[in-house]
């Protein structure tokens, strides 16, 4: 027997929704849709929900499963599951009113508008011509992405969300389209996406809305002078001056460190560690030394290009990739301690002709850590999954395993550890009010765990979560890089 919690609400009789618990027998590979039907049959519960094809093709059975968008016919039920309606006005139980998004689509005239342009096409359209638009055309309108997007949930009127961005891009990249779709994208908040990747994670058709739609439209905006945001221009200017997307009044970490010539393991510092947080770079060197590992920190390395790729300023990215490829070509393994850098090196650099063996510090250390040297730390901690580590690199277990190896630590998981903190996608610099709202939401989750510190593996996340905790009056809760926690245990 398993327990399943279902949100119940009738707009005609109830003032607010509530969860009801049901116990049912779980059959092998039982889906949420099967569970809802079993509950209705056993309890005569009359739970209202939509369904049709049962094959993941119609999108009608979209729901929230443990807080994330999903198809009821595809998601396997589990003990303790919470089933809620999508984030739209609720009509009854799991049935929602989608008229607002349907009206938006109608207002934007989101259908092919080719006018006279079609008649002027003198050549046939090839597969290559439609390659970009095909990547985003398989949407089944389940609205899982809209209900899961962190920005939509806190700024509904400001950001059209991944569903509309994908829809607009479908026509922006269609060679027959004659409307100015880019203006629509800008009006709907093209630069208000954090690049968290949650929409891809919940999409039953694996549509990469940020990578294949938003990021590309941002590049088009830059090319025609409509972008980037003024606050993003400095990224490129700084890189052209010193190879880093940020400035510093400190001595860069690379200039401070003694290199271990001959080591086949290298450290890709990233801009933030080299210029803003050199102490974290030193912690990496010290922790590895405790484990008998020498690491080289080669000179000549430059920004990974992530700030440029995320904001559409792509024209000098190839040069950055080539420089880093040359610097790191003779190393067997490249270590990163910034999730954004790691994701960019792994996922974007191969598109520019560079494929290095890159590992996040947690995946590198998890099976090498000398636990006998670790000393007790009397501390309660929680962990924040950086978007570009958890979803961008698929690394979730390794950091937690390392934390739990440290004696004396009490680990409390927060409600939604993988919810975006608001630091990415150029949001913290370009739309700081959105970044702050998301940071405060994350900070509240941290507060609920009664943790002394929140651990993460991203300098950008560290900064934004710190701002969020300060904003809600939790200055006493520390924000620590995983390496800082390990350093404390090795002292």
What do these predicted regions represent?
Residues 27-35, 76, 252:
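Short, structural beta-strand-to-alpha-helix junction motif
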Residues 37-70, 126-139, 180-197, 290-300, ...:
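Immediate flanking context of iron-sulfur cluster ligation sites
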Residues 53, 58-61, 73, 139-145, ...:
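Short cysteine clusters
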Residues 133, 141, 168-302, 306-353:
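Iron-sulfur-cluster electron-transfer modules
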Residues 7, 24-25, 64-68:
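Short strand-turn-strand beta-turns centered on an Asx-Gly dipeptide
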Residues 1-22:
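Eukaryote-biased recognition of intrinsically disordered, low-complexity regulatory segments
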Residues 30-42, 84-242, 319, 365, ...:
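Ferredoxin-type iron-sulfur electron-transfer modules in oxidoreductases and energy-metabolism complexes
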Residues 73, 272-357, 388-491:
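Cofactor-cradling patches in redox/metallo enzymes
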